[in-house]
Amino acid sequence: MMRQERSHTKVIATIGPITRNKEILEKLIHEGVDVFRVNLSHDLHEEHLKTITYIKELNEELGSNVAILGDLQGPKLRVGDMEDDKVMLEDGQEFSFVSTPCTGTTEKAFLSYERLPTDVSVGERILVDDGKLIFEVTGSNLTDTVTCRVIAGGPLSSKKGVNLPQTKISQPSLTEKDIKDALFLLDHHVDWLALSFVRKEKDILDLRKIVEAHPNNARIIAKIEKPEALEEIEGIISASDAVMVARGDLGVEVDFHKVPLIQKDIIKKCHNKSKPVILATSFASALVGVGLVIMLSIICVATITGFDFI
């Protein structure tokens, strides 16, 4: 279980295919990992169960108390498969997002959100691949197609994530997949459930009902990565057991230079309510080739600014 005393900033490590190995997990525990995160956006339940089982076995063998955090996918939007896995889009060209499954081309791509044609408005922007590609909505047929103009082009690859920073999404934050995943995680006694793309307090309360109806308990983390969440941040913090500032998606959804002030405000509000606050970002990939000094600097910043976990 996560500890709230601030003797040092605790470490959360995400487990993937490479680290889903008992020997590697043991090394990570010896290196000081406090929480292992399993990401339900990827892989089958059978693979995640292997990870959970290994962690529980190691806790028993080592006398450790490393917690398990199950991260629910939420309504993450992605494009479908692209022709030859990648196409090149030019600035100024026309492009369409469609809700009917298809192989993407230089003219259109499937987007895994059937309500997009009715949710978006002309002039709103659609961001792909963490904002590397930018599209401006020029029209919608209100059924299955949204037409756009490419503002910032480049390579569009299969399965890239999509952000709609100006669009009020009607899809619930807690999806059918999330409910199934949450029940699986509860069945196997994980310590924490993280809900992605939280937009309002009700999102947390809906997940809380599922947890309370299950014989096994778990604490709930609200992941802050949508600007709508900032409008109800007090209620979200109150309804949650901890809060995670997901800098990656949040930095795409709002002006990146605003993120430090936003996270500072969230930290203050969390500490006022005695709720742990977590800094989430892709440290490993960001630090490739950068070196230990930068990594230590990030950890120092996380500690000084008041994050309980990174």
What are these regions (language model features)?
Residues 1-310:
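Non-catalytic helical/linker scaffolds that mediate oligomerization, partner binding
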